[in-house]
Amino acid sequence: MVDTVIPGDMACLDADLLQLQEMSSFVLNSKPGFTQKLFDQWLSLPEAQRQVGSLLKDAVAGAPINVTGSASGSNSATIPSMFPAGSAPPLSPRSCGSPRTTKQRAPSNLGSTLKVVNEPVKEPIPQFYFQNGRPPPSEIKEQCMFRINHFFYGHMDGLQIQEFKLVTREICKLPSFFSTSLFRKIDLNNTGFVTRDAFIDFWVNGNMLIMDTTTQIFKILKQKDQSFIVKDDFKPLLKELLATHPGLEFLQSTPEFQERYAETVTYRIFYYINRSGNGRITFRELKRGNLIDAMLHADEEEDINKVLRYFSYEHFYVIYCKFWELDTDHDFLIDKENLMRYGNHALTYRIVDRIFSQVARKFTNKVEGKMGYEDFVYFILAEEDKSSVPSLEYWFKCIDLDANGIITRNEMQFFYEEQLHRMECMAQEAVLFEDILCQMIDMIGPENESHITLHDLKGSKLSGNVFNILFNLNKFMAFETRDPFLIRQERENPTLTDWDRFAHREYIRLSMEEDVEDASNGSAEVWDESSLEAPF
């Protein structure tokens, strides 16, 4: 053989390349020794060496390698000396180390020409990502544009805030008291006008048009650089509600109570919606809650007291008056002794201590040993609506003395001991702890009877009674005697919550007391603003 250096990829023998029609490639591959000798014999031929050398030079120089041959006859695929003269095996287009060469090839003719493979037709990929969401269908967009043109017709300079209310309600389908918040969201430069183009850019081009109502409201309420809603975000909303809702017109002469009403509504919203308790309502929390439905209801209902969720003035009145009754020095703060008087001294000292230790919720008021109005709103909602999840979480933290996530027998006994002592002092028939423990276990049906978890409480409709047994004597006794008045109330209005029933009873009581006081004074005189008492 000639002393020719053959690259590794070319030195590898592939039986298919020999193109022997007398023998199949399968036979050649099964006898590698014989095949190698055959290959060596061919490579020793001068003609083969010249052809291989020429191809190597072309390959090194980067020139295209052309291999020609004919497949017209049965002997045309043979190699020099062993095959007819003038034909040569083609070089493998890939190395023998390629995984593809492990696949068995069918014999091919040396003279076959390469087939031209047409490139696939390039089809444009439709856009699948939109920064502001997928744009609305053309039909919906056209309908919206027609309505926009109608409302902005004749207003070349744009609409002012009062004129913008119809746009908010008729085009955006949002509660009318969102008008100010939406207006300011669009009028970033505070010009006092929203032009047609500015509204289209925000509502149509920003794809607000096709978002669901919850997403629209969330984007309008939150600040631009935030991903959550805070209490201050509700201020313009509630200010407009107070200024425009027919059921709240009577408060316009008492701005201090307008402010208290707005605060109370906000606290109630965060109590029920902000489940994380961090003062920041996320989109997920907003979507899971019932605030949007309540807002839509408030916009449609002229009697604000029929909007029981969050916005009822009667509910605000009850909360504020209950706080005012306890705040004897009217500094808008209450201490432990003040709270002990709540519900006609219904609560135990031990539970009040736990409330003021702030294990259930950190007080927003920073005065040591004092509870502010916001803290009281959370307390009264938890106390009077023990069927709700926020209430169960509130009281669970109070009873769970070691904060280990379970309420044990010893922890329940610790709180019940004071209840037992109070019953004895009142000459009431005392119920032993062992008996009441069995009753509580039966009511909850915990997974493990040695302790009660928050999950156990959430799975039972009678969980509120367990807390009443442990620290509210009046409600415990009412439960033991099965107060027929309470049972009748529940049957008459099964859709109402415990809080709804409580607020209704208390409002009637407070109204009657107000009427008696007015009658004793001889006339219903105008409320003295300096007294900071409720107007009625």
Swiss-Prot record:
Annotated residues for binding of Ca(2+): D400, D402, N404, E411
Disordered, as annotated region: 69-108, 517-536
GO cellular component: cytoplasm; nucleus
Keywords recorded for this protein, A-Z: Calcium, Cytoplasm, Metal-binding, Nucleus, Repeat
Composition-biased stretches (Acidic residues): 526-536
Compartment(s) of residence: Cytoplasm; Nucleus
A molecular function (GO) term: calcium ion binding
SUPFAM superfamilies: EF-hand (SSF47473)
Positions with biased composition (Polar residues): 69-79, 98-108
Subunit structure: PP2A consists of a common heterodimeric core enzyme, composed of a 36 kDa catalytic subunit (subunit C) and a 65 kDa constant regulatory subunit (PR65 or subunit A), that associates with a variety of regulatory subunits. Proteins that associate with the core dimer include three families of regulatory subunits B (the R2/B/PR55/B55, R3/B''/PR72/PR130/PR59 and R5/B'/B56 families) and cell signaling molecules.
Function: Probable regulatory subunit of type 2A protein phosphatase.
Protein name: Probable serine/threonine protein phosphatase 2A regulatory subunit B''gamma
Gene: B''GAMMA
